[in-house]
Structure formats: C-alpha cells, structure tokens
Amino acid sequence: MNLNNKNRLTKDIVVYENFIDAETADKLVKVLDKHAELGTISWMPISFYESYSSVLPQDNDEHVISEGLPADIFTQIKEGIINAVASVHDLDPKIISQIGYHTQKWEPGAYARIHSDNTDEHGNSGAFTRSRYAAFLYLNENFEGGLLQFPEQELSIKPKVGMLAAFDGGFNNMHEVTLITSGVRYTIGSFWDDREEDAYPQELRDAWAAEMKETRAKQEVERAEWQELLKKGYKIDQDGNVYHFKQDVDQHD
C-alpha cells in the first residue's frame, strides 16, 4: 500500500492519493460483484440511506486469485490502513485496534446526513466511543455526487479511485456524504480505536452494549421502512420527501 502521497488537509483529516492503484481497485470491485452475483456475500442495508455493507472476502479467495491479485490483498489493505490511521497522529500502529472493517456499496439516491462517528449530534459520547478514527478507501470514481464533506471546516473531498481518507471520527469532524445522483459508489470502510476494549471499565462497556442494542433495534425498524418503500418503487430524499423512481431488476431484498 502506498503511504507516500500523504496530504494533510487539517490536523486530523488526511488523504492518501493512490493508496492503491486504479487497476487493483477495479479488480476489487469485480471481485465484490462476482461474490454478490454468486450469493457468497450479501449486501445488507446499514444506517445510511441506500447504503449497503458486506464482509470482505477471506485470504486465498478464488475470485481474488483469478483476478491476478495477491491472495491476501484484503489483509494487506487492512494493514496499510492501520499504518495510515496511526500516521495521522504519529501513533504506534501496534496500538491501533480494529472496530470495523468492511465494504460498502452506495446506490443512486444514497446519502449520509451530517454526523459524528463516535458521539451524538451534541458531542456526547456513548456506544460508539471506540470509533475514534475512520478511514475510507475509494474503489471507483465513475459515479456522480458522493462527496465527503466536513461543513465546519468548509472542506469537500471528491473521491478518486484508490484514494484513502483517514480522519478523527468525533464531534470536531462532523461530516456527511452528499447524494449519489448516478452510478454506484464502492468503498472499503473502517473504524479504529487507540486502545483495546478492556482498557474501558466494565460498567461503561455494559452501558455501551445496552445503548448499542437499543440503537440497532431502532435502525432495523427504519431500514425495514426504507426497504418496504423501495419494493413499492419509492425512495426518500435528503429532506425526507418520498419520490418515485424507476426500479431495476436486482433491487435489494
């Protein structure tokens, strides 16, 4: 992974141009699409509208190998991201603890409203406290919209194929993803902490678990409502308005 093209946009927002090359990124998308076609991975709706997530293929995956990629490419990418995240604050990569590492697919009409990755909208910490750092690897750029924006910093990042964006996920870096107006946006998303879970008091962890359970239940209800509308041929825009759209054959169930 290439960490040489480091561009520090703010003290805690960094992009790495050509973290992976365009050919590798294109092959990774083909691998993901092949797995989805075969049903060996499933795109599951997440908390952002018309955004879907899946686990990544394991090392020695036959479709990875058939594309001529290293058998452990996804492990290599993860290790590279760990080093990139650590580099934002000159941390020892050995202390970086994985919270989430997955792929995401953003369909036309998808967006993410302004949010903090590890606090609520008022800056209060809770169940997502450990998502201190975020990093997103962009696997394609043949879509319209889908900018990563930090309104407070008046900063807008246009995804480029192979680019990695790494930043502190907290209240000081509230961010959003603008509406995908056409095409499909593929990313590898990840969240990280700089300490292990057992560094936090058990009582606090128990409180987080209870809050997480409640939050996930609410999100599941919301996602079910979204999916029901999709089946009927309707989507929801960023302002909450429902509109009709032309359905494709392979709508998500």
What annotation goes with each model-predicted range?
Residues 1-164, 172-253:
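Fe(II)/2-oxoglutarate oxygenase catalytic core
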